[in-house]
Amino acid sequence: MVTIRLARGGAKKRPFYNIVVADSRNARDGRFIERVGFFNPLARGQEETLRLDLARVEHWVSNGAAATERVAKLIKDARKATA
């Protein structure tokens, strides 16, 4: 099954997440199909917290990809910010 989920990056105690489309059988930070955005929970000042390519997210969801609970909330927040 194809999922849209967070892949952790960044340094120790400084998380940074790529939002990726991946096969659910692959490791969390392993191989992915496409990177559709990022989430920076510790953004400071003018740094972006969230960037998502909503067109690509819609494409993958229409093709059967399931977003994880956290990513679904981030997608909802991104839609609200652009509207």
Swiss-Prot record:
GO biological process: translation
Assigned keywords, A-Z: Ribonucleoprotein, Ribosomal protein
GO terms for cellular component: cytoplasm; small ribosomal subunit
A Pfam family annotated for this UniProt entry: Ribosomal_S16
A GO molecular-function descriptor: structural constituent of ribosome
Superkingdom of origin organism: Bacteria
InterPro entries xref list: Ribosomal_bS16 (IPR000307), Ribosomal_bS16_CS (IPR020592), Ribosomal_bS16_dom_sf (IPR023803)
Family the UniProt entry places it in: Belongs to the bacterial ribosomal protein bS16 family.
Protein name, as recorded: Small ribosomal subunit protein bS16
Gene: rpsP
